């Protein structure tokens, strides 16, 4: 029996013998295997939560050498850019326009008084009393221009504007020129002036002027009822604001020598003046 098994085994091909009796030996694991089944669901179902171990993190801190009494490795002081900044052209133009606009606003001036001829009745009374009165005044680029009305007391007459640019530390007299008026009566004459403003005016100085009328050896002044005609910077006008009218009505009615009430300052302040709503042009 043993002989038959041995002969049968020896008669087999080598490949058949290896495939039939060969087997693999699994290597011995070096580390213990972890179970693939997790028990988290079981713990959650039972209502118990496995405790987790919280690791304590170490906070990071930054300290400099000079705080520890040591010397710094390198110290560099920046005074100017080594290379010029390459600013785009459109941004450069925008910055230049903003600077120029700010400068122009700070150098612009406005009139600090209303047009005298806006209230026709008051203007006529002042002309009758003082014999001279500023009619209109406008500010142009760097000049001030206007017209003056005077009573025709004599043929020979002189009209001038006395103006100061440094709060009356000094002043200059600017002559006015006669303007032929077709529609004006023979009892009134019109003069005009055009005064150039200095290039540099100190911000703390005031610009003021008054009108002088000389005739028959007499001198008459229009100083805006003692306040003078002032020219201020535009930025000051925005900060000062406009005066608020009184809450109650003014029942004081002033009558002029011509018998007409001054409705502009009497019972009817809301009525428009003779000139109209704009109140910018001459009364005639």
UniProtKB/Swiss-Prot annotation:
The gene is PPP1R3B. Residues 124-232 form the CBM21 domain. It comes from the Eukaryota. This is Protein phosphatase 1 regulatory subunit 3B. Disulfide bonds: none annotated. CDD domains: PBD_PPP1R3B (cd22814). It comes from Bos taurus (Bovine). It holds the Pfam family CBM_21. One of its GO terms (biological process) is glycogen metabolic process. InterPro entries: CBM21_dom, CBM21_dom_sf, Pase-1_reg-su_3B/C/D_met, PP1_3B, PP1_regulatory_subunit_3. Interacts with glycogen, PPP1CC catalytic subunit of PP1 and PYGL. Associates with glycogen particles. Forms complexes with debranching enzyme, glycogen phosphorylase, glycogen synthase and phosphorylase kinase which is necessary for its regulation of PP1 activity. The N-terminal region is required for binding to PP1, the central region is required for binding to glycogen and the C-terminal region is required for binding to PYGL. The lineage of its organism: Eukaryota, Metazoa, Chordata, Craniata, Vertebrata.
């Amino acid at each position: 029996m043993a002989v038959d098994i041995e002969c049968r085994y020896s008669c087999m091909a080598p490949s058949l013998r290896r495939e039939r009796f060969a087997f693999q030996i699994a290597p011995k694991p070096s580390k213990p295997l972890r179970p693939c089944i997790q028990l988290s669901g079981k713990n959650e179902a039972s209502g118990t939560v496995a405790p987790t171990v919280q690791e304590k993190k170490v906070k990071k801190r930054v300290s400099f050498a000079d705080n520890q009494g040591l010397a710094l490795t390198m110290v560099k002081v920046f005074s100017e850019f080594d290379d010029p900044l390459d600013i785009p052209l459109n941004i450069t133009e925008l910055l230049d326009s903003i600077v120029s606009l700010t400068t122009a606003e700070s150098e612009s001036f406005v009139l600090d008084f209303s047009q005298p001829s806006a209230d026709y009745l008051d203007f006529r009374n002042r002309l009758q009393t003082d014999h001279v009165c500023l009619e209109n005044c406008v500010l142009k680029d760097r000049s001030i221009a206007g017209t003056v009305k005077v009573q025709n007391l004599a043929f020979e007459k002189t009209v001038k504007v006395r103006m100061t640019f440094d709060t009356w530390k000094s002043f200059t007299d600017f002559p006015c020129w006669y303007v032929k008026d077709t529609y004006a009566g023979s009892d009134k004459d019109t003069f005009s002036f055009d005064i150039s403003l200095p290039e540099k005016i100190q911000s703390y100085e005031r610009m003021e002027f008054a009108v002088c009328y000389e005739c028959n050896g007499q001198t008459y002044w229009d100083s805006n009822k003692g306040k003078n005609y002032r020219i201020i910077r535009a930025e000051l006008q925005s900060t000062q604001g406009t005066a608020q009218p009184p809450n109650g009505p003014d029942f004081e009615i002033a009558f002029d020598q011509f018998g007409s009430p001054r409705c502009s300052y009497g019972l009817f302040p809301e009525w428009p003046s003779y000139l109209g709503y704009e109140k910018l042009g001459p009364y005639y």
